[in-house]
């Protein structure tokens, strides 16, 4: 049956999204007004993160994984760790022997 694996992937993505939304239930309506307000604010922030994750999961299944490797790096053999300013002598690091310490 053609397309069966794609359907399974989509169903699995939907199950993941369902679990994400179930993991962030609405806050309870008890407590002081300020406590309820803070709980709702935190819940909305978490809900926005869940929405973003759900969109990424669905986009990955529908459109395939995104290629976020925008920066082309040179081969690792050409990379080195050194101080580019360490090769030059700086006037700031010289000590004047005539200066007095107070």
Swiss-Prot record:
Stretches the record annotates as Disordered: 22-47, 81-102
Classification via Gene3D superfamilies: 6.10.140.630
Point to the regions of Basic residues compositional bias: 33-47
Q: Enumerate the GO terms in the molecular function aspect.
A: DNA-binding transcription factor activity; RNA binding
Q: Report the subcellular localization.
A: Host nucleus, Host nucleolus; Host cytoplasm
- InterPro entries given in the database record: REV_protein
Give the residue ranges of motif Nuclear localization signal and RNA-binding (RRE): 32-48
Q: Post-translation: what modifications? A: Asymmetrically arginine dimethylated at one site by host PRMT6. Methylation impairs the RNA-binding activity and export of viral RNA from the nucleus to the cytoplasm.
> Does the keyword Phosphoprotein belong to this entry?
yes
- Per the Swiss-Prot or TrEMBL record, what residue ranges does the short sequence motif Nuclear export signal and binding to XPO1 cover? 71-82
Keyword annotations of the record? AIDS, Host cytoplasm, Host nucleus, Host-virus interaction, Methylation, mRNA transport, Phosphoprotein, RNA-binding, Transport
The domain of life is Viruses
Gene Ontology biological-process entries: mRNA transport; viral process
Could you tell me which residues carry Phosphoserine? 5, 90
Q: Miscellaneous notes for this chain? A: HIV-1 lineages are divided in three main groups, M (for Major), O (for Outlier), and N (for New, or Non-M, Non-O). The vast majority of strains found worldwide belong to the group M. Group O seems to be endemic to and largely confined to Cameroon and neighboring countries in West Central Africa, where these viruses represent a small minority of HIV-1 strains. The group N is represented by a limited number of isolates from Cameroonian persons. The group M is further subdivided in 9 clades or subtypes (A to D, F to H, J and K).
Assembly mode: Homomultimer; when bound to the RRE. Multimeric assembly is essential for activity and may involve XPO1. Binds to human KPNB1, XPO1, TNPO1, RANBP5 and IPO7. Interacts with the viral Integrase. Interacts with human KHDRBS1. Interacts with human NAP1; this interaction decreases Rev multimerization and stimulates its activity. Interacts with human DEAD-box helicases DDX3 and DDX24; these interactions may serve for viral RNA export to the cytoplasm and packaging, respectively.
> Could you tell me what this protein does?
Escorts unspliced or incompletely spliced viral pre-mRNAs (late transcripts) out of the nucleus of infected cells. These pre-mRNAs carry a recognition sequence called Rev responsive element (RRE) located in the env gene, that is not present in fully spliced viral mRNAs (early transcripts). This function is essential since most viral proteins are translated from unspliced or partially spliced pre-mRNAs which cannot exit the nucleus by the pathway used by fully processed cellular mRNAs. Rev itself is translated from a fully spliced mRNA that readily exits the nucleus.
Q: What is known of its domains?
A: The RNA-binding motif binds to the RRE, a 240 bp stem-and-loop structure present in incompletely spliced viral pre-mRNAs. This region also contains the NLS which mediates nuclear localization via KPNB1 binding and, when the N-terminal sequence is present, nucleolar targeting. These overlapping functions prevent Rev bound to RRE from undesirable return to the nucleus. When Rev binds the RRE, the NLS becomes masked while the NES remains accessible. The leucine-rich NES mediates binding to human XPO1.
What family does the database annotate?
A: Belongs to the HIV-1 REV protein family.
Q: What is this protein called?
A: Protein Rev
Which organism is the protein's source? Human immunodeficiency virus type 1 group O (isolate ANT70)
Starting at the broadest rank, the lineage of the source organism is: Viruses, Riboviria, Pararnavirae, Artverviricota, Revtraviricetes
